[in-house]
Amino acid sequence: MADVTNGERCASPQELFSSIAAQGELVKSLKARKAPKEEIDSAVKMLLSLKTSYKEAMGEDYKADCPPGNSTPDSHGDPEAVDDKEDFVDPWTVRTSSAKGIDYDKLIVQFGSSKIDKELVNRIERATGQRPHRFLRRGIFFSHRDMNQVLDAYENKKPFYLYTGRGPSSEAMHVGHLIPFIFTKWLQDVFDVPLVVQMSDDEKYLWKDLTLEQVYGYTLENAKDIIACGFDVNKTFIFSDLDYMGMSPGFYKNVVKIQKHVTFNQVKGIFGFTDSDCIGKISFPAIQAAPSFSNSFPQIFHGQADIQCLIPCAIDQDPYFRMTRDVAPRIGYPKPALLHSTFFPALQGAQTKMSASDPNSSIFLTDTAKQIKTKVNKHAFSGGRDTIEEHRQFGGNCDVDVSFMYLTFFLEDDDKLEQIRKDYSSGAMLTGELKKELIDVLQPLVAEHQARRKEVTDEMVKEFMTPRQLCFHYQ
């Protein structure tokens, strides 16, 4: 990777912010591979120059997790306040006017994260000795924070752990909900590390018109789907916030520490809270942040507070963890690292993500083979032409075709995926044929998941959700 060019050439504070983040990653990479001192010194000098330019432009010091303009509450939490041509992403709303979906390169700049480039993918392959997951090969996980730092630790035999989660708002999960768990399972397998899975039933109670009994019931049902992804009970702890907060003083102490060091003004700026929001919403971000710190799980880590955390999640969850990364050094903990995924689009198109609240926008894990076929044929947005003649002549548009997008997530064979892309783009393959390819992938995927889920008993769920020592030993 070459040095970032001079800060004065950046067209905006956002671009300058992104340049600093990229240069910071370069410095870390050079140090990790023990590059010559002159090369490291040159990169550090460039980084300091960029930070000076940023301070001159913004009137304040660069902060890694606070992109310029990101703390203004005027439009946060209100997608209607955003220009129709702009993408809008927060933990509750994803919207774009583009049929191609969110512009993820712009989002990297806006959020101040770093792109997962080929160099990083290759480094993961070298570190694990395993072929990169298709989600990495195809840019589905596209952005990160401090992944090089995690790899540095791993290569030096230092431990880390994984943290991901699920907000249980319905009894049935859809195929889009599988994305973080499929990838997290792969990460756990190749790195051989512990995993904690937060079931944020408290969040869903605060945000949705649901009872405590309903959200807790959804937690238990969703836990069965998560377990059915193949996680090892000896390496995985799944917990309900409603349960765990009351039985783990270490977890609650971290929640309180975070709450003390984050102001109401900060959470308003990050999450768009208003004066009419209940106080539970305002305090919830601290609960989602707490699993990022290892001493929140004394039964696993025996009180150690310095074990690095890696969080695979969709990028709409990043605001929670920007806040977490900002507060971590102030309470004496390492910043969590993150791997961000793209959104799984609704059947009707990539302008929004798949939603469990709209049955026609989603392929549920409870759907029958017939329901899957009907939904894909009837609702999946097509990039094909209006007539067969036009399609044969001009070809289809894979960039907007939902069936092709879904195949990029679930079809393992890279060569077959590329052949489908070529055939559809050239007009050799028709929309109906492309949809059949997707149906042939989704039907067995869902059926196999259903078969595994049937094997998950209430006793197995209880075992996964019981606080206990896992098969890792910490001093």
From Swiss-Prot:
Motif ('HIGH' region): 168-177
Pfam families given in the database record: tRNA-synt_1b (PF00579), WHEP-TRS (PF00458)
PTM sites of type N6-succinyllysine: 158
Keyword terms of this UniProt record: Aminoacyl-tRNA synthetase, Angiogenesis, ATP-binding, Cytoplasm, Ligase, Nucleotide-binding, Phosphoprotein, Protein biosynthesis
Record note on modification: Proteolytic cleavage generates 2 forms; T1-TrpRS and T2-TrpRS.
InterPro entries: aa-tRNA-synth_I_CS, aa-tRNA-synth_Ic, Rossmann-like_a/b/a_fold, Trp-tRNA-ligase, uS15_NS1_RNA-bd_sf, WHEP-TRS_dom
Record's GO cellular component terms: cytoplasm
Alphabetical list of CDD domains matching this protein: TrpRS_core, WEPRS_RNA
UniProt GO BP: angiogenesis; tryptophanyl-tRNA aminoacylation
Catalytic activity: tRNA(Trp) + L-tryptophan + ATP = L-tryptophyl-tRNA(Trp) + AMP + diphosphate + H(+)
Record localization: Cytoplasm
GO molecular function annotations of the record: ATP binding; tryptophan-tRNA ligase activity
Domain WHEP-TRS: 12-68
UniProt cross-references to PROSITE patterns, sorted A to Z: AA_TRNA_LIGASE_I (PS00178), WHEP_TRS_1 (PS00762), WHEP_TRS_2 (PS51185)
E.C. number: 6.1.1.2
Disulfide bonds: none
Positions of region (Disordered): 61-87
UniProt motif ('KMSKS' region) ranges: 353-357
Chain positions found as Phosphoserine: 355
Similarity field: Belongs to the class-I aminoacyl-tRNA synthetase family.
Subunit annotation: Homodimer. Interacts with oxidized form of GAPDH.
UniProt xrefs under PANTHER family: TRYPTOPHAN--TRNA LIGASE, CYTOPLASMIC (PTHR10055:SF1), TRYPTOPHANYL-TRNA SYNTHETASE (PTHR10055)
Main function: Catalyzes the attachment of tryptophan to tRNA(Trp) in a two-step reaction: tryptophan is first activated by ATP to form Trp-AMP and then transferred to the acceptor end of the tRNA(Trp). Could also possess an angiostatic activity.
Name the UniProt record assigns to this protein: Tryptophan--tRNA ligase, cytoplasmic
